């Protein structure tokens, strides 16, 4: 327990909150060759590797993921949501924040239905997150 004198001299420092998606908060300025803190909801990138991964202990599956080289120079691992995908090695993708709880090190999601990524086929409910257009009747 600090004394009153110690608190008067130093004061209490507030805890620094850790960011969940740090790659989204930096932008690269190619003119001055320097990164700048400029948060954005999405970032564009190019896939360098597309593969599958097995989840942590109680779960069992083959989860699809991609290594993405972002426009700010960082390389991150992003999850590919939904059934089936058309993402290949040099596909341009858009990523958003949001971790996958049972995949260690995966803190980002790929946005379906934008850039080179197609939406999920034959999806009727919850289409917004999977980039699926409304059916023509």
Curated annotation (Swiss-Prot):
Residues 1-20 are annotated as: Disordered. Keywords: Methylation, Ribonucleoprotein, Ribosomal protein, RNA-binding, rRNA-binding, tRNA-binding. The modification 3-methylthioaspartic acid is found at residue 102. CDD domains: Ribosomal_S12 (cd03368). Disulfide bonds: none annotated. The keyword Ribosomal protein applies. The keyword Transmembrane helix does not apply. Transmembrane segments: none annotated. One of its GO terms (molecular function) is tRNA binding. GO terms for biological process: translation. GO terms for cellular component: small ribosomal subunit. HAMAP family: Ribosomal_uS12_B. With S4 and S5 plays an important role in translational accuracy. Belongs to the universal ribosomal protein uS12 family. Part of the 30S ribosomal subunit. Contacts proteins S8 and S17. May interact with IF1 in the 30S initiation complex. This is Small ribosomal subunit protein uS12. It comes from Mycoplasmopsis synoviae (strain 53). The gene is rpsL.
């Amino acid at each position: 327990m600090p004394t009153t004198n110690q608190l008067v001299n130093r004061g209490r420092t507030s805890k620094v909150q850790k960011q969940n998606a740090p790659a989204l908060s930096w932008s690269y300025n190619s003119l001055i060759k320097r990164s700048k803190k400029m948060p954005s909801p999405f970032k564009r990138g190019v896939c360098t590797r597309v593969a599958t991964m097995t989840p942590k202990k109680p779960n069992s599956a083959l989860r699809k993921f991609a290594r993405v080289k972002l426009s700010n120079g960082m390389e991150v691992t992003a999850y590919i949501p939904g059934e089936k995908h058309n993402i290949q090695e040099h596909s341009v993708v858009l990523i958003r924040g949001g971790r996958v709880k049972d995949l260690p090190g995966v803190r980002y999601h790929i946005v379906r239905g934008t850039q080179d990524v197609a939406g999920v086929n034959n999806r009727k409910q919850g289409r917004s997150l999977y980039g699926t257009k409304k059916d023509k009747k």
